[in-house]
């Protein structure tokens, strides 16, 4: 993380939120009034413009925001930010999160602090982190049958079946193992506090240039999470015949697989520019979100 104090100040701001969340829409209205008071140009996600017709704002897709805005604010949970990140990363537009969800590792501004914390960011008081994403390609013979990207993780699952999956893992062209399990999580450091953590994987600091591979209920007790270099190329060869597994990016709708399909995973060339207000601390976030104990008398 590097500090960007009193440098770039944002004026063209895009807003993204979940339309089905009344709490998010309430915070959006508050945010719009505040931004107009700061003489900012506001562009609203086209999927929610119909829920706020009284605001009279310009509507745009996430891609259009990436081209036109110098800051995008996502109001919602980490899932909302994950969806925005997969589109916005290629445009290098900074992204700021307001938490209207659950854990909020990525959306770290509380609703009660919207005006004060967003105000600090508009004044040029913020820090930024560059988080890498993963590219997914599914190959069937010489044909690419599916693609995707993920900020958190790419997950191989058994899908609708209760049977285990058989697959072979290759890293940078080297055979690692053949495994029978319920699946495999390939996670970035960002995703290490999400599904990978539930699967027994390690917490990885966001600065790390690494990936972690976490087996899901492997049939052998010696199959443990494996941390590899961030520029590694991961290939998973599906060898199971009884099951039609799924591979999913950040929990989105999966790609159905069949025997002899090959999943190829590598780091994307573009990174997400994630903005934090002053005082952001990864370890404090872990204490708050994961219930770690604090010093006596310390509320954080």
From Swiss-Prot:
Gene3D superfamilies: Probable inorganic polyphosphate/atp-NAD kinase, domain 1 (3.40.50.10330), Probable inorganic polyphosphate/atp-NAD kinase, domain 2 (2.60.200.30). It is found in: Cytoplasm. It comes from the Bacteria. Transmembrane segments: none annotated. Its cofactor is a divalent metal cation. One of its GO terms (molecular function) is metal ion binding. It catalyses: NAD(+) + ATP = ADP + NADP(+) + H(+). Involved in the regulation of the intracellular balance of NAD and NADP, and is a key enzyme in the biosynthesis of NADP. Catalyzes specifically the phosphorylation on 2'-hydroxyl of the adenosine moiety of NAD to yield NADP. NCBIfam families: PRK01231.1. PANTHER family: NAD KINASE. HAMAP family: NAD_kinase. Belongs to the NAD kinase family. This is NAD kinase. It comes from Alcanivorax borkumensis (strain ATCC 700651 / DSM 11573 / NCIMB 13689 / SK2). The lineage of its organism: Bacteria, Pseudomonadati, Pseudomonadota, Gammaproteobacteria, Oceanospirillales. The gene is nadK.
């Amino acid at each position: 993380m590097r500090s960007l104090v009193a440098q770039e100040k944002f004026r063209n701001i895009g807003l993204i939120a979940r339309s089905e969340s009344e709490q998010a829409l309430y915070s959006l209205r508050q945010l719009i009034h505040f931004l107009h008071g700061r003489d900012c140009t506001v562009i609203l996600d086209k999927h929610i413009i119909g829920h706020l017709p009284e605001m009279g704002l310009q509507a745009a897709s996430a891609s259009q925001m990436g081209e036109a805005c110098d800051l995008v604010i996502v109001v919602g949970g980490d899932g909302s930010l994950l969806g925005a990140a997969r589109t916005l990363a290629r445009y290098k537009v900074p992204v700021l999160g307001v938490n209207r969800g659950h854990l909020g590792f990525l959306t770290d501004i509380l609703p009660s602090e919207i005006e004060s914390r967003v105000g600090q960011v508009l004044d040029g008081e913020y820090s930024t982190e560059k988080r890498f994403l993963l590219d997914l390609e599914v190959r069937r013979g010489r044909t690419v049958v599916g693609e995707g990207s993920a900020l958190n993780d790419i997950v191989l699952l058994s899908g609708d079946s209760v049977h285990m999956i058989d697959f072979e893992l290759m890293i940078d062209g080297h055979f690692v193992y053949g495994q029978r399990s319920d699946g495999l999580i390939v996670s970035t450091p960002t995703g290490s506090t999400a599904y990978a953590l539930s699967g027994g994987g390690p917490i990885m600091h966001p600065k790390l240039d690494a990936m972690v591979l976490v087996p899901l209920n492997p049939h052998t007790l010696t199959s443990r999470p494996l941390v590899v270099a961030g520029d590694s190329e991961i290939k998973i060869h599906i060898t199971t015949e009884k099951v039609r597994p799924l591979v999913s990016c950040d929990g989105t709708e999966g790609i159905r697989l069949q025997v002899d399909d090959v999943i190829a995973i590598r780091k994307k060339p573009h990174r997400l520019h994630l903005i934090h207000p002053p005082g952001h601390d990864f370890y404090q976030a872990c204490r708050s979100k994961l219930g770690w104990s604090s010093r006596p008398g310390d509320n954080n």
